[in-house]
């Protein structure tokens, strides 16, 4: 609409004024927001209760404005009767922000400091296992695949094992797009001309990752906050996801990642994220890059992989490729 109703502006002012939206919102509106999140939890299985509520409510207000619902309670009624709007709101709350080689210096550090140590610790035939948690539409996973390939091609340091990059997200549309590996020209600005030429093919004005790069990455819908985690990971990247969560969920996620990592594994977070909530689990490798190593202490993770998760993981493994970096990688 051309003019957002005054009521929405008032609620936005309350939420953005000092960030304490729970205390400042009228109790009736606060209860309505909780009911909206409850609807999404029932439909999608994702609980946004411990996500940063200021961000969540801004997104809800945006959908209210688009649908010309002046009061939160009228939007709740509309939402209950409209499953499509529930799906749209859910996707809106996921806040996908990603890019190829975001923070380029971080990727340089991976090649200089992380990948050499991972390769050094590998026995002959032992796979390199990487998990990109919260991968959105795939740019981060493909960036890591390209970065790793460039490093291995340059050094010829790892020729006998398989490379397994697992990329997960709770958004089905995001995962579907990631699997295609197709991106518009504007989406590929983080790639060099050489990378674009070597690792992508042009299709109808867009660019698709080559099959060799796509085969390195296995994409799956997965919620690392509630689904059984993957294990024996050498490296986990979870960038710009934790910033949308309250400390309780951040600690839960970081504990899960500690459980998933090998004893000498690495964790990469976003520039505004930290492991300060669980200092006993991680040691800082690079403060600038928010790169951490796993401390060899017993974590607090309590969930064990189920038979279903082990089978799903096995199914994912069958899609990975054993490669020789110098030839058909």
Where are these regions (language model features)?
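Conserved SAM-binding loop of SAM-dependent methyltransferases across substrates and taxa
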Residues: 137-158
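Short "lid" loop at the C-terminus of a central beta-strand within the Rossmann-like core
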Residues: 171-172, 225-226, 272-276, 299-300
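Extended basic-aromatic, gly/pro-enriched interface segments that bind polyanionic ligands
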Residues: 133, 154-235, 241-251
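A short glycine-rich, Lys/Arg-flanked "PGG" loop and its adjoining helix->strand segment in the class I
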Residues: 250-263
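Conserved class I S-adenosyl-L-methionine
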Residues: 173-175, 179, 235, 271-289
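Conserved beta-strand signature within the Rossmann-like core of class I S-adenosyl-L-methionine
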Residues: 263-271
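A short N-terminal interaction module
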Residues: 6-128, 234
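PAS-family sensory modules
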Residues: 296-329
